[in-house]
Amino acid sequence: MLEVGNAYEIEFSFTQEQVNDFCKISGDFNPLHWDEAYAATTPFKKPIIHGALIASVFSRVMGMEFPGEGSVYLKQVSEFKRPLFVGITYKAKFEIVSTNPAKHTAEISTQVFDLERGKLMVDGIASAMHTALF
């Protein structure tokens, strides 16, 4: 059984090729994500990673690692505090903040940090159900 306070961390990064693939999969071809010349005219100065692609890390972890296989990812609320860029290693942190054993659910803090700068990039909360673990 997983309990309040149990935590998990994973490091990740994305390549421009992965971002371009996500453009195709999602249909979001906003030049802010792939066009260096366009992005240079924005406050970000270079292409940024789609928020939904960043959130895919949460989906991967929730479904495969923590809580893992058999879990149902019910909800995600995320605040994107700073832009994320390709080629930078980030750390995603997960921590169980509450459980409801009667419903086999948990609320899990989901955060992304820039390892180099130590800054919080994404702050969120997720809900998951797992009949064997909560």
Kindly label every feature range from the protein language model.
Residues 1-71:
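Hot-dog-fold acyl-thioester-processing enzymes
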Residues 10-14, 78, 126-128:
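Generic detection of short hydrophobic beta-strand segments and adjacent strand-loop junctions
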Residues 64-92:
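Mid-chain, well-packed structural core segment of small domains
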Residues 16-18, 76, 111:
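Residue-identity detector for glutamine
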Residues 1-7, 84-134:
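HotDog/MaoC-like acyl-thioester-processing domains
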